[in-house]
Amino acid sequence: MSDLHNESIFITGGGSGLGLALVERFIEEGAQVATLELSAAKVASLRQRFGEHILAVEGNVTCYADYQRAVDQILTRSGKLDCFIGNAGIWDHNASLVNTPAETLETGFHELFNVNVLGYLLGAKACAPALIASEGSMIFTLSNAAWYPGGGGPLYTTSKHAATGLIRQLAYELAPKVRVNGVGPCGMASDLRGPQALGQSETSIMQSLTPEKIAAILPLQFFPQPADFTGPYVMLASRRNNRALSGVMINADAGLAIRGIRHVAAGLDL
């Protein structure tokens, strides 16, 4: 039996991409899964696909009341909350400082930070009492942009650096009751969109990047799928497998940190 059997897991942005892969994985692990999802169509799809195995709540991660409504439903359903996974986010499609008009930069900043940073903070606030009671955990999705430049423009990259600070501060504030960690995936096949303020709300990340371009820059030389990143979340959520980690950011970057100066990887001819 999985360590996560009957554990109560709350994931934001569970309707597509990494969020959907996490929903699938935690259900496979026997967990009671809930998600807060902005898209009504995706909520309906989740309910149709997973039935009683999913509690899908339509709502916005920038709205505390929506979070509280979801937590109330989770506690009614499961009687507890063991892990909160802040995952919903938006990307800036590499919108640069020089080429982005000042007024667009300002509105884009507020929209992107509201989702990528405030959304995590509000989720932590709504979930903290239940997680303190269960001595559970929080896990936040980062990005390779939390470590390196060029994984987005200044808006996205700064938001992910801000999220690392939030993880460390929450890990400090909530210890010893709640473990708080992060996972930073590299580029993958997903439907990640951009801010409406930048005219990117209908543009997905795969319209800006190709599988070939992503695989070429990774030393492991493959194009990741969302399911490839779910393992670290399962480990961090497990009390048995993660008794000691808090304030830790797992850099799941397919080897980006060890790229060579002359070659992406030295073993390409092996």
UniProtKB/Swiss-Prot annotation:
GO biological process: one example: 3-phenylpropionate catabolic process
CDD domains: BphB-like_SDR_c
Pfam family, any one: adh_short
Superkingdom per UniProt: Bacteria
Annotated binding of substrate, by residue: S143
Matches recorded under SUPFAM superfamilies: NAD(P)-binding Rossmann-fold domains
Keyword Oxidoreductase: yes
Active-site positions on this chain: Y156
Transmembrane segments: none
EC number per UniProt: 1.3.1.87
Entry keyword set: Aromatic hydrocarbons catabolism, NAD, Oxidoreductase
InterPro entries registered for this protein in UniProt: BphB-like_SDR, Dihydrodiol_DH_HcaB, NAD(P)-bd_dom_sf, Sc_DH/Rdtase_CS, SDR_fam
Pathway involvement of the protein, from the record: Aromatic compound metabolism; 3-phenylpropanoate degradation
Known function: Converts 3-phenylpropionate-dihydrodiol (PP-dihydrodiol) and cinnamic acid-dihydrodiol (CI-dihydrodiol) into 3-(2,3-dihydroxylphenyl)propanoic acid (DHPP) and 2,3-dihydroxicinnamic acid (DHCI), respectively.
Family: Belongs to the short-chain dehydrogenases/reductases (SDR) family.
Name of the featured protein: 3-phenylpropionate-dihydrodiol/cinnamic acid-dihydrodiol dehydrogenase
Species name: Shigella flexneri
Lineage of the organism: Bacteria, Pseudomonadati, Pseudomonadota, Gammaproteobacteria, Enterobacterales
